[in-house]
């Protein structure tokens, strides 16, 4: 009898202890599919979900390089490793010391040279509406302003928007306090700043003004706006360049002590001399980077500069690759080329814009715009 009770107790114990094990096994089996679903929904940084639910890679098209420019915070927007726009804060940097990761501009080196280690990569910002949510107190942050434009550009390329829908027009004058450029640094004068708008399908992409300019600025907002637009048209979809700015009002030739610098003008009307020949480029692995040019400034391969045998230093010329129609405005700051049959030696950055890196040389048309 006792032995029968003992076996009964053992059987009940096995039954009770075995039940949780089965429960755990069933729970594990039920959880596994949920884990698989979560894994399939995960998207890595730099990738996005397509409309079919397939995961596709979104290459890094834009990058933002923060730096200091004239004592102010700045950020240069690169598209496909080519500098396009520079955003500058309206207020000077509080500290005079150069921060870690910032580039000073006291040695003649262009401050927007691409440094991939210190650049902010903008591969995919997801929902563009989220990128527009910004604190008003941060609107002066050049990196945030550049990031918003970069997000829009990435979205345009993702949506296969036609680049010929990128246009530029005159927006009008904006009354703003601009620090005087005279030696009296404490004074400020009320000036009307010209503004231009770059649009895509009649929606503003970016405004060109005193604090948002072409990366290699021509010191003329009209020229900056037109060149930035044409650079965007080419880099987004290889569209042909525009010849002039829309809605540009007629201006009287006099009313300013420096009308060339202050009044917008059509680039074509400022051509003083033109000629053709073969262009080459330098600064790519040849040891010239950082060395003094004929003007004494240090050579920056990514700056929009060029060498010519006789044009005065500081002269700006528009160089057009006659093979593909691409053009760029460069500043003469060096002497050369000294190879027979070549008329101009471009920086690596300018050559990249013209699409002649692979060939090394290209037939070009050169138009002298003045200084």
Curated annotation (Swiss-Prot):
Residues 177-191 have a biased composition (Low complexity). GO terms for biological process: cell wall organization; peptidoglycan metabolic process. Keywords: Cell wall biogenesis/degradation, Lyase, Signal. It is an enzyme of class 4 (lyase). GO terms for molecular function: lytic endotransglycosylase activity. Residues 1-25 form the signal peptide. Residues 177-196 are annotated as: Disordered. Its EC number is 4.2.2.-. InterPro entries: RlpA (IPR034718), RlpA-like_DPBB (IPR009009), RlpA-like_sf (IPR036908), RplA (IPR012997). Gene3D superfamilies: RlpA-like domain. Lytic transglycosylase with a strong preference for naked glycan strands that lack stem peptides. Belongs to the RlpA family. This is Probable endolytic peptidoglycan transglycosylase RlpA.
């Amino acid at each position: 009898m006792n032995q029968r009770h003992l076996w009964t107790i053992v059987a009940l114990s096995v039954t009770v202890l075995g039940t949780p094990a089965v429960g755990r096994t069933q729970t594990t089996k039920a959880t596994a599919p949920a884990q698989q679903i979560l894994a399939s929904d995960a998207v890595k940084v730099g990738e996005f979900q397509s409309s079919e639910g397939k995961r596709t890679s979104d290459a890094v098209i834009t990058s933002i390089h923060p730096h200091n420019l004239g004592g102010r915070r700045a950020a240069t927007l690169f598209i496909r490793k080519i500098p396009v726009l520079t955003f500058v804060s309206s207020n000077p940097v509080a500290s005079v010391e150069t921060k870690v990761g910032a580039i000073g501009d006291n040695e003649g080196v262009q401050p927007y040279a691409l440094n991939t280690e210190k650049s902010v990569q903008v591969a995919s910002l997801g929902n563009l509406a989220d990128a527009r949510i910004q604190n008003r107190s941060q609107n002066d942050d050049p990196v945030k302003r550049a990031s918003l434009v970069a997000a829009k550009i990435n979205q345009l390329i993702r949506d296969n928007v036609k680049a010929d829908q990128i246009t530029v027009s005159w927006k009008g004058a904006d009354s703003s306090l601009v620090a005087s450029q005279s030696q009296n640094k404490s004074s400020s004068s009320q000036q009307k700043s010209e503004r231009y708008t770059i649009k895509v399908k009649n929606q503003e992409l970016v405004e060109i003004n005193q604090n948002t300019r072409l990366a290699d600025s021509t010191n003329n907002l009209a020229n900056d706006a037109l060149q930035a637009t044409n650079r965007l048209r080419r880099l987004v979809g290889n569209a042909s360049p525009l010849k002039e700015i829309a809605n540009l009002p007629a201006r009287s030739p006099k009313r300013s002590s420096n009308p060339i610098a202050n009044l917008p003008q059509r680039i074509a009307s400022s051509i003083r001399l033109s000629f053709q020949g073969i262009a080459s480029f330098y600064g790519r692995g040849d040891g010239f980077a950082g060395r003094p040019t004929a003007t004494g400034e240090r050579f920056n391969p990514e700056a929009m500069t060029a060498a010519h045998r006789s044009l005065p230093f500081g002269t700006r010329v528009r160089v057009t690759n006659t093979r593909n129609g691409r053009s760029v405005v460069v500043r003469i700051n060096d002497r050369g080329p000294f190879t027979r049959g070549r008329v101009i030696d471009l920086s690596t950055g300018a050559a990249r814009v013209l699409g002649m890196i692979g060939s090394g040389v290209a037939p070009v048309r050169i138009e002298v715009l003045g200084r």
